[in-house]
Amino acid sequence: MQWLITIAIVLAAFGFVVVKLRRFWFEFSRLGSSDLSDQEVSGGPKSSCYGCSGSSASESDLGIRIKPLVQLGDKRKHSVVSMCFLQAAVGGVVYGQEVRPPNYDETIASNYKLGSVLAGPQGQLIESKDQWPAHRKYLLDLFADQEYGYAPQGSVEVRTEVIDDGQGVLGGEVQAGIRRRQLAVFLERNGKQVRIDLLVWSPSDRPKAPCFLGLNFRGNQSTSDDPKVRLTSSWCDSRNPGVVENRATEASRASQSERWPIEEILERGYAVATAHYSDIDPDYDDGFENGVHGLFPEHRSDAEHPNRWGSIAAWAWGLSRLADVLEKLEGIDPKGLMVVGHSRLGKTALWAGANDERFGLVISNNSGCGGAALSQRVYGESVARINTSFPHWFNRNFRKYNDREDQMHFDQHQLIASIAPRPVYIASASNDKWADPLGELLSGHHASSAYRLHGKQGLETQELPAVNTPIGDGAIGYHLRQGDHDLLLYDWEQFMIFAKRNGF
């Protein structure tokens, strides 16, 4: 009897340890979930930003940087132990495997074989643009089923309240020619409600301006120094400037204004709209209970439904609900909507643009793995790495390709192709090896046959251009900016040049 009691105690202790490790991994996954640098995890060489690319060989090999102490939303503090221990003790518990170190050897990365973007499920090639609508649906179903997850089919009521409508304040001065509007967008279903704060800047002298729409990482107040922009009440990562216990404070204002050069955008006649991505779905793994997932509890992802939506699909779905508002908003050209995103939100912009044809131009900035970069190159961030660090971003089916990218019968060039014939712009950064700039370029190149099918020019080259030398005179554009994983004025300048060239 004594030995049975001993075994029971040992098993109970082991179970307790496993539960604690899984909980620790859940909290640990949240460490990368903000846009402190918005790189998924570290790992790429030559970076100067925390969470971007590792600054030492050991950090690069491990694929993440270590922060000794982290303040989390429940006010508990956890010491972060070495990634080696986490991968061995936790990664194996969660997924039954360790994550391989990142590859930066181009001779290894070039060993892959892609299918044609014009090939159907049986390998047959479509030959005319009349066949394109059905083929595009096949591609979107493929990505929904195997990577991003299907959004629910149920409808929501979209209700809008104007919170503020006046002149914008930029650089500390009231701007007479700039109109700033703040709208509370309520998504309502079955007695539940989600609020999204939409901030819209538009030139006062243009009756209908084409509009860039993109989500931000830290709240609308972080995108400018305008003191009248409402402080976000949604979850924020406590490591970001001006955030205390996962809530933004006044000190967070303008903390990412360099990513939103509002004056320069408006000077060129464009409007720009943004919302905090956490308004749509807070960026941590809670089993899909909060945000817009909570509006559809019957559509929650689980082991029995591995192809239901993850957070990227939820953010993309939210962008479409914001498009519902913008296409009816005074001063905005409903035929001039353009979706833009950086990093994980670049992935989001691609998925939103692929599904919603109201976005006439789609822009991906440093979107990397699960975005514009080819997964089968396994260069920089891998499928296993991203699924382990951020299990809530994609659907469960995508995990079966962890360290098995060679078994994928699809890749991101087909996602780019699904946007055709609408123009798409892909931007990379020279130091952002983690996001695989060449893999991003090659997706555009291999998507080009879908554009040629529509009589449009794609991206012909398979070689990276010189830094700060944009390429692509047709419907697919690309540039490699000098520098790190970021979204800067130079990037926006190229986006606007490309937009104008394509009729926006």
PLM feature segments, named:
Residues 40-70:
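Cysteine-cluster motifs in flexible loop/terminal segments that predominantly coordinate metals
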Residues 197-198, 208-217:
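Short beta-strand element of the alpha/beta-hydrolase
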Residues 214-328, 371, 375-377:
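Cap/lid segment of the alpha/beta-hydrolase catalytic domain
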Residues 292-295, 364-415, 440-461:
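Mobile cap/lid helix-loop segments that gate and shape the active-site cleft of serine hydrolases
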Residues 331-343:
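Alpha/beta-hydrolase fold nucleophile elbow
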Residues 420-437, 481-483:
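Conserved strand-to-loop "acid loop" that flanks and positions the catalytic carboxylate
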